[in-house]
């Protein structure tokens, strides 16, 4: 039986899918419990959802001729401690900058007078 992990309501965050899949790998290690292998868990958030909606020939896995958005991780994508290194959408690198990274960069090495009045 194939298992897919996806968004089932608007309040659910898609960024948690790798964590949910990783949890199922951990459950498989509990004696008497069921869970997924690492490969099954990765497929549950990539190729299996594409197959379920009938798009398995176009999306869900990296093969020549298929459309792909790719995320590059600095470790195991199913581990909570792994971080995103790069994102490509339709082959184009995407910026990973966000409000938090811009604030970090702005105040990492503050210069004289660069801090807001409240911080001086």
Where are these regions (language model features)?
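Short, solvent-exposed cationic patches
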Residues: 109-120
């Amino acid at each position: 039986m194939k298992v897919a992990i996806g968004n089932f309501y608007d309040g659910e965050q898609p960024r948690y899918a790798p964590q949910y899949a990783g949890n199922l790998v951990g459950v498989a290690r509990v004696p008497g419990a069921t869970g997924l292998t690492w490969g099954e868990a990765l497929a549950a958030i990539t190729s299996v959802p594409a197959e379920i909606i009938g798009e398995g020939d176009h999306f869900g896995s990296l093969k020549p001729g298929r459309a792909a958005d790719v995320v590059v991780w600095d470790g195991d994508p199913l581990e909570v401690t792994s971080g995103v290194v790069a994102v490509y959408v339709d082959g184009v690198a995407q910026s990973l900058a966000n409000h938090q990274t811009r604030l970090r960069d702005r105040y990492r090495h503050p210069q004289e007078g660069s801090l807001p009045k409240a911080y001086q």
